[in-house]
């Protein structure tokens, strides 16, 4: 009798934990994908910087520090403490918007090398994965209640051929912002994934 009770308890535990296991699996895939994109962004940015003269690097970095990425208009946690206080759904929604904001600009990153041509399809896969996670966690909440007010312009003016200096600035800004945003998404998804493990330490 005791053995039967034990077996039923184990089966019951397995059934009750299944949704969490599925959620963790989806999160693991999403985190793995954004980690790959973040590493790719770091490599592309580093390669571009290496191709510049020292003075060009200094000037471009100075300009970038005074400028903003288009995605800065997406409201997101201002520091690690606010990130840790944010709900899973909020972190997922912000991540979705950040990834979505790169659907058009990522086309300008393509070409020249195989890694660059991987960016757009991998962003699309990541966006789909995050959307699945949102649907699994929204629990009746309205999806992106203020998204209609969010209209991000493309990075730079891609309808005119820029001069050499402008082209360098534009490429630098594009790669730097892409790296910055993929780092944000990686952080948000990692924290959200950690929330599925009640005993885990999600400190950044």
From Swiss-Prot:
Family: Belongs to the somatotropin/prolactin family.
Main location as per UniProt: secreted
GO terms for MF: growth hormone activity; growth hormone receptor binding; metal ion binding
GO CC term (a single one): extracellular space
InterPro entries membership: 4_helix_cytokine-like_core, Somatotropin, Somatotropin/Prolactin, Somatotropin_CS
Disulfide bonds: 69-177, 194-202
Species of provenance: Acanthopagrus butcheri
Residues where Pyrrolidone carboxylic acid is found: 18
Gene3D superfamilies in UniProt: 1.20.1250.10
GO biological process terms, semicolon-separated: animal organ development; growth hormone receptor signaling pathway; positive regulation of growth; positive regulation of receptor signaling pathway via JAK-STAT; response to nutrient levels
One Pfam family this sequence matches: Hormone_1
Signal peptide (from-to): 1-17
Protein name per Swiss-Prot or TrEMBL: Somatotropin
Annotated residues for binding of Zn(2+): 36, 186
């Amino acid at each position: 009798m005791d053995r039967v009770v034990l077996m039923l308890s184990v089966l019951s535990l397995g059934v009750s934990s299944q949704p969490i296991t599925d959620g963790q699996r989806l999160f693991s895939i999403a985190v793995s994908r954004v980690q790959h994109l973040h590493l790719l962004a770091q490599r592309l940015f580093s390669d571009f910087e290496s191709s510049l003269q020292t003075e060009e690097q200094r000037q471009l970095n100075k300009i970038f520090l005074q400028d903003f990425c288009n995605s800065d208009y997406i409201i997101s946690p201002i520091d690690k403490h606010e990130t840790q206080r944010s709900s899973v759904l909020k972190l997922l929604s912000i991540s979705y918007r950040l990834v979505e904001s790169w659907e058009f600009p990522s086309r300008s990153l393509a070409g020249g090398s195989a890694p660059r041509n991987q960016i757009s399809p991998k962003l699309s896969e990541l966006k789909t994965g995050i959307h699945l996670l949102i649907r699994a966690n929204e629990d009746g909440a309205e999806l992106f209640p203020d998204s209609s007010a969010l209209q991000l312009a493309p990075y730079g003016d891609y309808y005119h051929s820029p001069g050499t200096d402008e082209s360098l600035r534009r490429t630098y800004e594009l790669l730097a912002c892409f790296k910055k945003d993929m780092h944000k998404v990686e952080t948000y998804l990692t924290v959200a994934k950690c929330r599925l493990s009640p005993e885990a330490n999600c400190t950044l």
